UniProtKB/Swiss-Prot annotation:
Disulphide bridges, residue numbers: none
GO cellular component, one term: nucleus
A Gene Ontology biological process term: response to hypoxia
Species, as recorded: Caenorhabditis elegans
Record's subunit section: Interacts with hif-1 (hydroxylated on 'Pro-621'); the interaction induces hif-1 degradation. May be a component of the cullin E3 ubiquitin ligase complex.
Domain of life: Eukaryota
InterPro entries: VHL_beta_dom, VHL_beta_dom_sf, VHL_sf, VHL_tumour_suppress_b/a_dom
Xref: Pfam families: VHL (PF01847)
Protein name: von Hippel-Lindau tumor suppressor homolog
Function in brief: Involved in the response to variation in environmental oxygen levels by targeting the hypoxia-inducible transcription factor hif-1 for proteasomal degradation when oxygen levels are normal (around 20%). By regulating hif-1 expression, plays a role in iron homeostasis, aging, heat acclimation and progeny size. Mediates resistance to enteropathogenic E.coli. Mediates susceptibility to B.thuringiensis pore-forming toxins. Not involved in P.aeruginosa susceptibility.
Keywords linked to the UniProt accession: Ubl conjugation pathway
Disrupted gene: phenotype observed: Increased mortality induced by B.thuringiensis pore-forming toxins Cry21A and Cry21B. Increased mortality and sensitivity to paralysis induced by enteropathogenic E.coli infection. Increased mortality upon heat stress. RNAi-mediated knockdown causes an enhanced resistance to polyglutamine or amyloid-beta-mediated paralysis and an increase in adult life span.
């Protein structure tokens, strides 16, 4: 069963990177429609996620990017995947006419999760040292899933800490 935070091959982020074949600037507005904060990442040419900002519910982030620059979003507190325009990876497209400036609106929404996944992830809000005692009564398979979620949350935290914010004044709307 997928835990919702990883790609099918077990990674928190897809194995994609940016290229620079098209240098036309594209304006994008990411709008968070989730009930929780989300982190917005650009996947750089080295295939590493670069965090551009954290968006609270109903807040937005305006950025300038290019075609062939993939973007993803993750739930801030645990790295669970969310959707950008109903897809796991957003690929910006330039305006149909060269002299037309258009802002692409990208709506970030929750990904559908099973009840089992939601229940397992509910333990992530507890202090990690308390979780083993709280899950003792669960079947062994569910205990392993909760421990897996905790490991992924830790891995996500480490990635976010390593991620270097982009230069310049582009920041989330307050």
């Amino acid at each position: 069963m997928s835990d919702g935070s990883m790609d099918d091959d077990g990674r928190l982020f897809p194995d994609l990177g940016s290229s620079t074949h098209d240098n036309r600037e594209i304006r994008v507005r990411f709008l968070n429609r989730c009930a929780y904060p989300v982190d917005v990442f650009w996947l750089n040419p080295s295939k590493q996620p670069t965090k551009y900002g954290t968006l609270a519910q109903k807040k937005y982030l305006d950025i300038k990017t290019f075609k062939d620059h993939p973007w993803v979003a993750r739930r801030s507190f645990d790295g669970c995947k969310v959707l950008v325009n109903e897809k796991e990876v957003f690929w910006p497209e330039p305006a149909p006419r060269m002299n037309l400036i258009v802002r692409n609106h990208c709506v970030i929404t929750m990904k559908v999760q099973s009840l089992r996944e939601i229940a397992g992830r509910s333990f992530l809000r507890h202090n990690p040292t308390e979780v083993p005692n709280k899950i003792k009564g669960l079947p062994r398979e569910l205990q392993f899933e909760v421990k897996h979620f905790l490991d992924r949350k830790q891995e996500y935290s480490e990635i976010v800490c390593r991620s270097i914010p982009p230069p310049g004044p582009q920041r989330p709307q307050q």
